[in-house]
A protein has these predicted regions:
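N-terminal alpha-helical scaffold/docking segments in eukaryotic complex subunits
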Residues: 1-82
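Aromatic-residue detector
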Residues: 8-17, 95-96, 101, 108, ...
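Structural detector for internal amphipathic alpha-helices that build alpha-solenoid repeat scaffolds
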Residues: 34-43, 52-57, 69-89, 107-121, ...
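Amphipathic alpha-helical scaffolding segments comprising HEAT/armadillo-like alpha-solenoid repeats
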Residues: 62-69, 89-102, 122-134, 153-158
């Protein structure tokens, strides 16, 4: 599959998911819908495949901002299985952390924080863990604090 097809596939699964969400829940914000609602999306395996192909074939530094936001949103919506977050290469994980810093997506921050121990640079992992510890979302903060402890990050005791 060529890069153009991979990019189109990511965009298609993103827009298809939004259409489904709108049909099922109207204009409700994700955090107001309730738990595990994304599990009812029958096409989630297609989302996983599109995200996997995208991060494997398109270098993170080459992503357009909109592509990064779409991948971040889909990662957030995969919060029960955490498959997307778990398969991100390091460069993609870091790019999504930066995208989250610029424009957070509900349920994405804690998933990114949980993946920080995979980073090759302990200093970078500490930096991002501290960032997520200060997230306005309480659950993201808690998960980031647990990760900080496992990383033996200096900010953990503050």
């Amino acid at each position: 599959m060529n890069q153009s097809s991979v990019i189109e596939k990511l965009h298609r699964v993103y827009t298809d998911f939004l259409v489904w969400k709108s049909a099922e829940f109207g204009k409700q914000a994700e955090q107001d819908i309730g738990g595990e609602w994304e599990c009812n999306y029958a096409a989630m395996p297609e989302v996983w495949a599109a995200c996997f192909d995208f991060v494997q074939q398109i270098p993170a530094h080459a992503w357009q901002p909109e592509q990064a936001r779409q991948l971040l949103y889909l990662t957030a919506r995969d919060n029960e299985s955490e498959y997307i977050a778990g398969m991100l290469p390091e460069s993609a994980l870091l790019r999504l952390c930066e995208t989250y810093r610029q424009q957070p997506a509900y349920d994405a921050g804690w998933q990114l924080a949980v993946q920080l121990p995979r980073l090759s640079s302990q200093a970078v992992a500490w930096q991002w863990a501290e960032f997520f510890c200060n997230d306005p979302d309480e659950y993201t903060c808690r998960r980031a604090l647990m990760v900080s402890g496992s990383l033996h990050a200096p900010h953990t005791e503050r």
